[in-house]
Curated annotation (Swiss-Prot):
Sample GO molecular function, one term: histidine-tRNA ligase activity
Example of a GO cellular component annotation carried by this entry: cytoplasm
GO biological processes: histidyl-tRNA aminoacylation
Catalytic activity: tRNA(His) + L-histidine + ATP = L-histidyl-tRNA(His) + AMP + diphosphate + H(+)
Alphabetical keyword list: Aminoacyl-tRNA synthetase, ATP-binding, Cytoplasm, Ligase, Nucleotide-binding, Protein biosynthesis
PROSITE patterns, per database record: AA_TRNA_LIGASE_II
HAMAP family documented for this protein: His_tRNA_synth (MF_00127)
Name the UniProt record assigns to this protein: Histidine--tRNA ligase
Length: 424
């Protein structure tokens, strides 16, 4: 029987795993500058964690969730996104308590699962990097979150970034807008797609996010949320814009933009790039916003949150296309060639000592002739080759060859520590 990976998954093989490490390390370095720390939550949660947070009408819950009953009869779901599990952990571990400095700032990275049609950059098992900050109602944390996403992408040298923002207002704003949207859409009910018909009275804002072309035409002239904001909601959004202006950040306000998850309110944003391998026109590579009711929804007190998420696979597609090359593995510092059976203990010691000095070091494991070992050193692009034969062993020395210049010299085994300065 021929075994293959499940549809919609991928094997991340060397040397491409280095690209993932590169992205993850840059994320960690960027987030640390903003005083964020890593959080790790389970890959699966109780189904209700996602159904209550994402919303019963969201595509994630109605179409895309991997859920099942386990052997104990518990309804379990593989996580389709990162925020809900982080919020659950925040509530369960009482991170809202007075002993924890506010805002609580965390980031996460790891696999997520959605049953979607696999396509380039969109798999059923995909990887997400995200951040969440809890405990501040200030527009400053909204702006900080946006800037952190921008800084991360700029650190990766992604060019042509476009920031799009909107507000979904507070509860009163949304209630007023919700009714206005229903009043506008009801006369078009029979023209709407089946999905939008089902959402009209449950969450009409999701109709604005429909991918159906006819739905998109209908909502072109729909009322805009900016006309229904309360004074407080307007003040919050104005502060966000003013702070972005202060930082010299260009942005576009798109009043029709909503988020695919039901828990967002106030500031939402997307960081886009135009005409890339991800698609023609503006394509979103990072998205997020504020969610002031989600902690309460999952059993906690009234605590606000704000965050973003981005897909690693899509980001790597973009990075590789922009650089026209894949990231290289760290170059091999030393390849140690052993000639003859009698020298193998010395080879073992030299390899070990070089690694203790933090040099990337390799040796032969296949009992090959010296010529084959030198070929391996060349293929692995080693900077230096150490050669130990029986005569070198007897004289307690080894030969050191610079593979770039071809220069070769002799080094005493007792002076191997002098190589510490060799690659500085």
């Amino acid at each position: 029987m021929k075994y293959q990976k499940p549809k919609g998954t991928a094997d991340i093989l060397p040397p491409f795993s280095k690209e993932w490490q590169f992205v993850e390390q840059n994320a960690r370095e960027t987030f640390a500058l903003y005083n964020y720390e890593e959080i790790r939550t389970p890959i699966f949660e109780k189904f209700e964690v996602f159904s209550r947070s994402a919303g019963d009408t969201s595509d994630i819950v109605t179409k895309e969730m991997y859920d099942f009953d386990d052997k104990g009869g518990r309804h379990i779901a593989l996580r389709p996104e990162g925020t809900a599990g982080v919020v659950r952990a925040f509530v369960e571990n009482k991170l809202y308590g007075p002993e924890h400095q506010k805002p609580v700032k965390v980031y996460y990275m790891g696999p997520m699962f959605r049953y979607e049609r696999p396509q380039s950059g969109r798999l059923r098992e995909f990887h997400q990097i995200g951040v969440e900050a809890f405990g501040s109602d200030s527009p400053k944390i909204d702006v900080e979150t946006i800037m952190m996403g921008m800084d991360f992408l700029k650190k990766l040298k992604v060019s042509g970034l476009k920031l799009v923002i909107n507000t979904l207002g507070d509860k009163e704003s949304r209630d007023r807008y919700r009714q206005a949207l229903i009043d506008y859409l009801e006369p078009h009910f029979e023209e709407l797609s089946d999905d939008s018909k089902a959402r009209l009275h449950k969450n009409p804002l999701r109709v604005l996010d429909s991918k159906d072309k006819n739905d998109q035409k209908i909502v072109e002239n729909a009322p805009e949320i900016l006309d229904f904001l309360t004074e407080d909601a307007q003040k919050h959004f104005t502060s966000v814009k003013e702070e972005l202006d202060t930082l010299g950040v260009d942005y576009v306000v798109d009043s029709s933009m909503v988020r695919g998850l039901d828990y967002y309110n106030h500031t939402i944003f997307e960081i886009m790039i135009a005409d890339s391998p991800l698609g023609k026109g503006d394509v979103t590579i990072c998205a997020g916003g504020r969610y002031n009711g989600l902690v309460e929804e999952l059993g906690g007190p009234e605590v606000s949150g704000v965050g973003f998420g981005l897909g690693v696979e899509r980001l790597l597609l973009l990075l590789n296309a922009e650089t026209q090359t894949t990231l290289q593995s760290k170059q091999l510092d030393f390849y140690v060639v052993g000639i003859g059976d009698l020298v193998q203990n010395d080879v073992l010691k030299v390899v070990h000592e070089l690694r203790q000095m933090n040099f990337v070091t390799e040796q032969d494991y296949l009992d090959r002739k010296p010529k084959a070992q030198f070929k391996s050193a060349d293929k692995l692009n080693a900077k230096y080759v150490v050669t130990i034969g029986e005569s070198e062993m007897n004289d307690r020395i080894f030969k050191l060859k610079d593979m770039h210049s071809g220069e070769e010299r002799t080094v005493a085994l007792s002076e191997i520590n002098t190589l510490k300065d060799l690659l500085k």
